């Protein structure tokens, strides 16, 4: 069940995996899920260890795709390739598909980080090393700092007293969950570098205040966040951030620098309006 879509996911699941120990348990669970599973092939029965492994392996596979694409995006930037075209090209391959191929500033939340760690720890207890998943974790932790690194490079290593606007605090849209959110890493690094931060998120403001208190300023809306800002960092791709009024930003920002952590903006369009634009890849 995805945060923000749990009810819909329950009513219309892709598949339901059930671990059972007896035929009686299977019959009971089959009867329970039948109204929601008109296509019986989406109801999968297996033993309990396999059911647990399916859950952890599925989320770890998705996390792997994200970290892989972030690695590819960073390489694209170095060799002059367009990561969006690369994403479309490999996503058009029916063996791969287009989902979870979007580069960004790292994944967070309660599921992906936890499940990747769980498989790594389970393997260690069994005397095995999950080398791929360890790399997935390493790439993701590094990726959470990528907007900071780009900003630091833009200002030649000096962010002291820079006014930085953050759009998005939650780890993804449609939730206030900030567990393992990239915004937390960004905030820590920006404060350590001496920058001032003003942040806005449609619903995660209270959660952010609970977590970090008054270490940053909190905006009343997305445009208040960018008032007199030296740079804007897009961290969470909320719908309301997708089509801002760039004319307002151009008039209210001190220095029109935009760092797009989710690659949702048109760089050519922004550069045509005299913005300095950075994306992932």
Place the predicted regions along the sequence by residue.
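Structural/interface elements that position substrates and couple domains in central-metabolism enzymes
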Residues: 1-281
């Amino acid at each position: 069940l995805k945060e923000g879509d749990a009810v819909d996911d329950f009513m219309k699941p892709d598949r339901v995996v059930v671990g059972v120990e007896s035929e009686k348990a299977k019959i009971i669970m089959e009867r329970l899920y039948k109204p929601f599973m008109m296509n019986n092939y989406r109801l999968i029965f297996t033993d309990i260890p396999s059911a647990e492994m399916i859950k952890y392996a599925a989320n770890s596979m998705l996390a792997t795709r994200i970290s892989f694409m972030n690695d590819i995006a960073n390489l694209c930037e170095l060799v002059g390739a367009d990561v969006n075209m690369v994403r479309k090209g490999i996503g058009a391959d029916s063996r791969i598909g287009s989902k979870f191929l979007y580069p960004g500033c790292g994944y967070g939340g309660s599921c992906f980080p936890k499940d990747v760690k769980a498989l790594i720890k389970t393997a260690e207890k069994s005397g095995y090393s999950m080398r791929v998943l360890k790399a997935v974790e390493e790439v993701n932790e590094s990726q959470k700092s990528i907007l900071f690194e780009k900003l630091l490079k833009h200002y030649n290593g000096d962010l002291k007293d820079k006014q930085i606007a953050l759009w998005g605090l939650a780890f993804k849209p449609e939730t206030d969950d900030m567990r393992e959110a990239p915004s937390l890493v960004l905030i820590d690094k920006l404060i350590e570098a001496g920058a001032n931060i003003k942040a806005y998120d449609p619903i995660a403001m209270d959660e952010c205040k609970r977590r970090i208190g008054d270490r940053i300023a909190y905006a009343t809306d997305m445009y208040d966040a960018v008032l007199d800002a030296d740079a804007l960092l897009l961290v969470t791709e909320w719908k309301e951030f997708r089509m801002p009024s760039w004319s307002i930003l151009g008039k209210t920002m001190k220095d029109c620098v935009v760092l797009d952590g989710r690659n949702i903006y048109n760089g050519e369009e922004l550069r045509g309006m005299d913005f300095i634009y950075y994306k992932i890849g």
